[in-house]
Amino acid sequence: RIQLTDLTMHSNMGEGKLSMIYTATDKHRGSTGFDLDVKQILVDKLISLFPSIDTLLPMLRSFEGVVDCQMAASCELDSTLMVKLPTLRASCSLQGKNMVLLDGETFTEISKKLMFKNKNRNVIDSISVDMVVKDNKMEVFPFIIQMDRYKVAVGGTQQMDMSFNYHISVLKSPVPFKLGIDIKGTPEKFDYDITKCRYKDLFSPSKTNRLDTVKINVRKQIYDSVRKQMNLLSSEPESIRPSGNLALEQVAE
């Protein structure tokens, strides 16, 4: 067993704290868990310091800038120390300001439809995203992005094979009505449809409080499960009720 507790880092790349544990029952299998909290670090430096984050949160590669990141994760490993994705559980919160959304085929197509003015440099004033990973799927809770002439809410799911199912609610735009965009597929091949604005009331004061409560509860369930494994209080992670659409249904009630 290898265990690190409250390992701290201070550098020109940022600062952070890490606790982690690795255990192996035999040469064929093992398990690991970590609790990470980093402040004011460049996204590319975060990925280079902790390559596993790129596996857990592939959407990070779409952003450039400085972020704060809090993450807890646990998983089982095979004999080559590769993550067994079905066993992966993770909770992550990202906060950043003056972020740049990197150009990609998906964004290029959407920006054409929405007539973004600044297509070469897509600056986001601020971003605060909460995500959980469970059952080979990452759920991104709805969050607000303000960019160019638009205010949009984004949420959805992304599989570990990089396929995704996202919804974008356009809350403010030059168009005099609200609309939604469903995007499904992979970065190489995807489809999008104009739909109803699913999140139009989700960020009203009353619904925002309920959404925050749901996010906190789901994150806490994942976090407690990870800490439980790290503290070796149980050999099996506790059962966690899937968040999925049920979380949004709770907010909508």
Question: Which ranges hold each PLM region?
Answer:
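Extended serine/threonine-enriched, polar tracts that run as long, contiguous segments within proteins
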Residues: 133-161
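Membrane-proximal interfacial segments on either side of biological membranes
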Residues: 1-10, 14-126, 133, 155-253
